[in-house]
Amino acid sequence: MGTALLTDRYELTMIDAAMGSGTHGRECVFEVFTRRLPEGRRYGVVAGIGRLLDAVEQFRFTDEELRYLGDAAVVRPETIQWLADFRFGGTIHGYREGETYFPGSPILVVEGTFAEAVILETLVLSILNYDSAVASAAARMVSAAGSRPLAEMGSRRAQERAAVGAARAAYIAGFAATSNLEAGRTWGIPTMGTAAHSFTLLHDSEEEAFAAQVAALGPGTTLLVDTFDIATGVERAVAAAGPGLGAVRIDSVDLPVQVAAVRA
């Protein structure tokens, strides 16, 4: 999917109006920064730069997109011709991914003519806002976990493309793996997974489900133990995988209480 129409209409109408007034070619500097952080947060973590640079490199208007803009009378024909020839020729510089940022600090600076810089505004903010928010939250989790590895498994709770960005952002912040295969393919992130309750219910018993999973994936797999009774599920998981059991997963109930009980 292209990136050119992943923008707000007014970005293009501003360019259209600026072309009419002859100001679209004026050199400008745009800075990306946050005014404040959420309460209780002392810093944020930058992520999304790599995804953004890829998006800028691919930023082209297709013939179909240009026809849409013309048919919808979004901009004038001369502006459509400018869009047809558009290639970003400015400069982009800023923080590296994984670095911390604070309110007022310029995370990213885009320099170029007004038209070629402002056309990227929505795309820049869309990617950096989301990815940096995920990375900032993930960094706090990594800090709390200490030496224990964390895996990102949030794909089903995000829009499908955002899930890839979230997996990448979490990995940048220190997560060890993701369940998202597209993130693994595109960005080389280690992938992992467990099993769902449906897999357990597919079998005649929890023991049979665990045995099938261990037979397929080895004892180092992670077994889901809360389909029925957690305490019994843990016992069955250990019996199925032995001392080489990778981990058990709890997906419901009061997690802080149950996790502490299982670890004990």
What residue ranges belong to the model's regions?
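Glycine-rich phosphate/ribose-binding loops and adjacent secondary-structure elements
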Residues: S198-A264
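Ordered alpha/beta subdomains of enzyme catalytic regions
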Residues: M1-A216
